[in-house]
Amino acid sequence: MPVLAILKDKSCEAAQVKLNALGATLAFVDASRIESFAQALAGAETAISCMASGNLHVDSIDDFWAIDRDANIRFGLEAVRAGAKHVILVATFEGRDSRRLTEFSDAKECAVDAIGAACRQAGVAFTVIRPTAYFSDLTNRAFDSVLKRGRYTVIGDGSHRINPVDGDDVAAFIADCIDDPRMADSEHQVGGPDIFTFRAIGLLAAEVIGLPGPLKIRAIPLWLLRLVAALATIVGLVSQRSRRSAAILRWMIYSGSHDAIGVSCGTGRLCDDFRSKRDGQIRVASLRNEAITLDRDPGSGRHQL
């Protein structure tokens, strides 16, 4: 089956290389214009959107209203117009439960509602995939924090549970939804095979890294986050940036105080992902040391880097 990967920017070269290696054709679109999707989606039988705002510190053209809501709606509506038989949207795990508490969740749920309505009207299958949290999210936050600072942060007491999932396993699950009509036209909350508390994730990272001393765990009280969110909400009456920050804080409060356990899919394990990241760091350090040795100037004793 030919695959066309639609990207909204060219900033991530690693993703482009990986997609090309898998045999996908790449198309770049302006996510702010519905016309931009028309050519890319022409003739598509199945359209899958994983679009989400890149990180928590974004401006108005790349925040959750612009991407999670508006860009996804443009994509979904154009996919239906283009004649797709199946539209798949990757959404947040807790979105339906937390949308009334935070605009961060409501943004993606607005896309779920709008695309779902368009698909029902057109007789198109609509599937929603809700992963708990990707390994990459935890690697970038937990692992890197423990590795660089020997410190780890939890919201509340860190006792709430989650079964994070490998992105490759989610991709395989989506492929199953395409191949098996019984899995289509449904919502799926998916996670990985292992359940952790948020505190245990930091301890796992410390164990894999081989942290020489005890891990410093900093617990941020929920009351403090609620206070900051309330202040940001007030300032948000006159500042879009503060309104955005308040929404993200309320989402963090919800996510950090509720379990997120999805149906186990795949075989990828967080401990193996952490070990892979650790081994990668060791290889980089080894190559750097070799480069210093090879480039040493014997005359001056200085490194030519």
Task: Enumerate the predicted regions with their spans.
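Oxidoreductase cofactor-interface core, primarily capturing Rossmann-like NAD(P)-dependent enzymes
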Residues: 1, 6, 12-15, 82, ...
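Terminal hydrophobic/aromatic helix or amphipathic segment near a protein terminus
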Residues: 205-256
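Amphipathic terminal alpha-helices
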Residues: 256-305
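Short alpha-helix in the Rossmann-fold core of NAD(P)-dependent oxidoreductases
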Residues: 65-69, 88, 108
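Conserved catalytic-site loops of classical short-chain dehydrogenases/reductases
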Residues: 46-48, 85-89, 127
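Non-catalytic, hydrophobic alpha-helical segments
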Residues: 47, 170, 174, 190, ...
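Active-site beta-alpha turn of Rossmann-fold NAD(P)-dependent dehydrogenases/reductases
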Residues: 51, 88-92, 130-132
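NAD(P)H-binding glycine-rich loop region in Rossmannoid oxidoreductase-like domains
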Residues: 8-81, 96-98
